[in-house]
């Protein structure tokens, strides 16, 4: 009779030890203390050895917006009493990604998106990497598709340059 009680007691103690070790294992796995989670990222290009070419937009940090550089999206959604700022931001992200994918490797600078009443104007500077006919086709394709998606007229204002315009080296 004593043997079954001792074996049951031993099994119970073993179960408690196993539960404690599982509990400490689970608790230690829930806390993530990796250095990757603690990194901060600056929204500017860091100054290096002076061999990194940057454009005018990238050379100035974000706190110079409206002083030395302009807004990349111009609309009235952020005025007091106006709604739809979040929707316009999502639309701007889609437009930027769409144009980056359509004109892959040809963007020389950031895209500026302007909204005037019902008209959507997209200003871009491209590098001449493709034949002119292909540029004209892609511009018409982009205007037509975005006009169909957003149910408003879309106009692309395009300039082309031979190579990427470098403002300075950081």
Swiss-Prot record:
Record bears the keyword Ribosomal protein: yes
- GO biological process, alphabetically ordered: mitochondrial translation
Q: Name one Pfam family in it.
A: MRP-S24
Q: Which GO terms describe its molecular function?
A: structural constituent of ribosome
Organelle targeting sequence: 1-30
Principal location:
mitochondrion
Q: Which InterPro entries does the record cross-reference, listed alphabetically?
A: Ribosomal_uS3m
| Keyword annotations | Mitochondrion, Ribonucleoprotein, Ribosomal protein, Transit peptide
Compartment(s): Mitochondrion
* A cellular component term, taken from the record's GO annotations: mitochondrial small ribosomal subunit
Report the sequence similarity comment from the record.
Belongs to the universal ribosomal protein uS3 family.
What subunit structure does UniProt give? Answer: Component of the mitochondrial ribosome small subunit (28S) which comprises a 12S rRNA and about 30 distinct proteins.
Q: What is this protein called?
A: Small ribosomal subunit protein uS3mA
